[in-house]
Amino acid sequence: MSESAWSLHSRLKEDTIDIGDLPLSKVLVIKDAHYPWLLLVPRRPDAVEIIDLDEVEQAQLMTEISRVSRALKEITKCDKLNVAALGNLVPQLHVHIIARRTSDAAWPRPVWGVMKPLAHDATEVQTFISALRRKIWLG
């Protein structure tokens, strides 16, 4: 499928900050300072499930999940990573990668619906994004 027909779902646009593109996926930061929380969104029109990607794209997505997860873990020094493709509210395929700490407000439960989203401090989120870009794209 052509990437040119692809566009980011409106809810994802509203709830995230775009930090760049990997070969398959757009990398986004969720606008919630409670958790270091990233999304990978494969730029494939009509992809709802991972099985909607062909085998090469599925392998590329796993490579990107590993790359971004490793960067997030190194930057945050988190206790646990949560990685999930749920899509119950947004039908566009996207993968959540969330750095969790045993001290966070939702631990050990899932993060959804536990706390009202907290806006990021502008300086802190830019520092975080810069660190992510260095780790993800420069290794």
Question: Language-model features: where?
Answer:
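HIT superfamily nucleotide-processing domains
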Residues: 1-93, 97-139
